[in-house]
Regions:
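Short flexible/disordered coil segments
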Residues: 173-177, 190, 286, 303-305, ...
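Active-site micro-motifs of SAM-dependent methyltransferase domains
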Residues: 36, 223, 284, 339, ...
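Ampipathic, surface-exposed secondary-structure segments
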Residues: 40-52, 177-184, 288-293, 399-429, ...
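Extracellular glycosylation-rich, acidic/polar low-complexity regions of adhesion-
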Residues: 1-311
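Feature responds to low-complexity, polar/acidic, surface-exposed segments characteristic
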Residues: 310-326, 334, 339-405, 411-437, ...
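Ca2+-coordinating acidic residues in Ca2+-binding motifs
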Residues: 93, 111, 220, 237, ...
């Protein structure tokens, strides 16, 4: 119906004849971009007994966008920090998002379309960059005039990796908008959501077997937010839904969405009505990011619910749900990428050997199991295959430790990551290794950041738990 044609039709409540319009079959569908309210004036007719010709007029108001039960937060890229911790915007996060949304095109530069409403955004906050200018606040009136290069070619260009956010206060979410450009003019506009809470909002993780639905962990989400902010949430808004290849998140009998504010409690439209149903045959990791809202609908923080869908849950006696690497170890063990000791333990704090790390990296990259080529040397087959494929050179000691540099070099080669097209500015001050840079650009490894300086510590060794995190990211990057 159009607005003009509504007045020429009658809509019946209750019994009606064939061909009449039922009142309860009227639906209003708002345009996707519409935010506001629609008013429909009506006259209702009826009565009882001898008073059957009564009528009353009224107005029906349908509100969208700012109405109760609806939320409009957006976060294509999401960060969490605390009131006293400066947040460095990761240029590689933006570059990966750009590639994802353009099916592989490279980010060349971006401009800011908005700045955070709370807190302050700076360029070159620590005054350590040789690109662009000295420390410069970026305000609503100035930010849009600066072009930030992903790979600056001269000192006059502004380096995208030098954007720093300084919080102001606690328990809020704010955002930063941008438009990225490729060399051929392709554009992507997106939003960075920044959550500032008294302490980080803990990830809520659960694991399920293949084909088994999972109820949304409403109570755990409530506890995680309350612990981080000191306040109880009233509702949440989902920021992203599971990929279609993974499964469907339902609210009752209908697919969930990213605009509804799902209340904490029971009943229709509540968090307790959310459940994830994985697709038949799917195994892997699913992340469901959200913002936590107070009773006024204002965000007080952001978090994530993660679900591991596995063939079977394999457990180790020394790895519990509170162990920091529980997610990585559980999913990798189920995928037969990682294993423990004969006594049923995993020993996540033990230093990992070169041979054990080599095996994990190759399996995560898609290599098959390699039988020993030397009697009594468990990992000799992996070393032989790695040498043949150019992943390793020389004769490393398989029972000795492996360094962070060696891990990065083997992993980047195993994943066949490109070492061309990387930013001109190196991400770390203590290594110029291109494989380290490629793996960092892929989001698989990170460094140590302090007062404007990032280091990688290439000669440090790693524990079994630390390598499980790297291998998990590798495996998920190739799914």
């Amino acid at each position: 119906f159009t607005r003009s044609s509504l007045s020429s039709n009658k809509f019946y409540y209750g019994d009606s004849d064939y061909g009449d319009y039922d009142l309860d079959e009227l639906s209003f569908v708002a345009d996707k971009s519409f935010s506001g309210s629609v008013e429909l004036s009506f006259t209702a007719y009826g009565g009882t007994g001898t008073r059957t010709n009564q009528n009353v007029t009224g107005t029906l108001v349908i509100a969208t966008g700012t109405s109760a039960g609806v939320s409009r937060y957006v976060g294509n890229i999401r960060y969490n920090t605390t009131p006293s911790t400066a947040l460095q915007i990761n240029a590689n996060d933006i570059a990966r998002l750009f590639r994802k949304y353009t099916s592989g095109e490279a980010l060349q530069y971006l401009t800011l379309t908005s700045v955070p409403a709370t807190g302050s955004l700076y360029y070159n906050y620590y005054n350590t960059s040789k690109y662009g200018s000295a420390q410069m606040p970026l305000t609503a009136s100035t930010a849009g005039n600066v072009v930030f290069s992903y790979s600056p070619a001269s000192a006059s260009e502004y380096d995208l990796s030098e954007l720093t956010y300084i919080p102001s206060g606690s328990n809020y979410c704010t955002s930063l908008g941008f438009t990225g450009y490729s060399s051929n003019g392709t554009t992507v506009s997106a939003t960075i959501l920044i959550s500032v809470t008294a302490s980080p909002v803990s990830e809520v993780y659960s694991v399920t077997t293949k084909g088994t639905s999972v109820n949304f962990p409403a109570n755990s989400v409530y506890s995680a937010v309350a612990s981080a902010t000191g306040f109880g949430l009233s509702s949440i808004q989902l920021l992203e839904l599971p990929a279609s290849k993974a499964g469907v998140l339902y609210s009752g009998s209908y697919a969930a969405d990213v605009t509804t504010a799902y209340s904490y409690g029971d009943g229709t439209g509540s968090m307790s009505q959310l459940r994830f149903i994985p697709n038949s045959g799917f195994t892997g990791s699913v992340s469901i990011p959200y913002v936590a809202l107070n009773s006024s609908g204002t965000a007080i923080g952001s978090g994530v619910v993660s679900i591991g869908v596995v063939d079977s849950v394999k457990k180790f006696t020394d790895i519990s749900t509170s162990t920091w690497c529980y997610k990585y170890v559980t999913e990798l063990a189920s995928a037969n990428v990682i294993s423990g000791y004969s006594n049923g333990t995993f020993q996540e704090k033990n230093t990992i050997t070169y041979g054990a790390a080599l095996k994990l990296i190759m399996l995560a990259a898609g290599y098959s199991e390699q039988a020993p080529t030397v009697k009594g040397s468990t990992f000799s087959g992996y070393l032989a295959k790695a040498k043949a494929d150019g992943l390793v050179s020389g004769n490393p000691k398989l029972n000795g430790p492996i360094t962070r540099l060696q891990i990065a070099q083997i992993a980047a080669k195993a994943l066949k990551l490109s070492t061309t097209g990387l930013p001109s500015k190196k991400p770390f001050t203590d290594t110029n290794d291109v494989y380290v840079q490629a793996l960092n650009a892929a989001g698989i490894i990170e460094g140590y950041f302090s007062n404007g300086t990032s280091t990688y510590k290439p000669n440090n060794t790693l524990t079994r738990g630390q390598v499980s995190a790297i291998v998990w990211r590798m495996k998920n990057s190739v799914q």
